[in-house]
Amino acid sequence: GRRIMGETPEQQGLDTMWDNRIWVHVLYRITTAFHVLHEGLGPKLELTSNHGWGEHCRKEALAHAGLVDRYLSDGRDWLLGGEEPTFSDITLATAIAFSKYPVNATPLDERFEHLAAFWQRWLGRPAFLAAYADRNSGVPELDDRA
């Protein structure tokens, strides 16, 4: 079967690199901004409120999302350029989905052309939509579809 992290050692290295970059510099930054900008999440989720740090994290996430957007601008559908997504693509889709929570106010697909096309490719995949079949994700675009 297909290898989710790439077929060759080079592809596997690139997939790991992109996965780490997206997790650390995009998804984790959006998650951190969410936690430090919002109160009332409870002691297990709520970090110390710090609006300055939250805005810094939001800006950093946007800057790195711009880098990923430029990388996708060569016309590739997926980060490694293959016909199917790899693990790093799943991490990027997760980052875009989390950015779309209304309280985050950082919808990456609305800010970056190639991330928008990337997101639309995920929305066209039945297996991706099946993961949101309960329509309780908090992302209106996934929950309110016909």
Question: Which stretches of residues belong to each language-model region?
Answer:
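Surface-exposed helix-capping loop/turn segments at secondary-structure junctions
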Residues: R70-G82, P126-Y132
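Acidic/histidine-enriched, glycine/proline-rich intrinsically disordered or flexible terminal extensions
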Residues: R135-A146
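GST superfamily/GST-like fold recognition
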Residues: L80-A105, A116, W122
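Structural helix-adjacent loops and short alpha-helical linkers that scaffold large soluble proteins
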Residues: T8, N104-R111
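GST-like domain detector, emphasizing the conserved glutathione-binding G-site
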Residues: G1-E55
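Short helix-capping/linker segments at secondary-structure and domain boundaries
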Residues: H38-P43, S99-P107
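All-alpha amphipathic helical-bundle segments outside canonical DNA-binding/catalytic cores
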Residues: I4-L14, H56-C57, D74-S88
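Amphipathic alpha-helical packing segments from all-alpha helical-bundle domains
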Residues: G54-L72
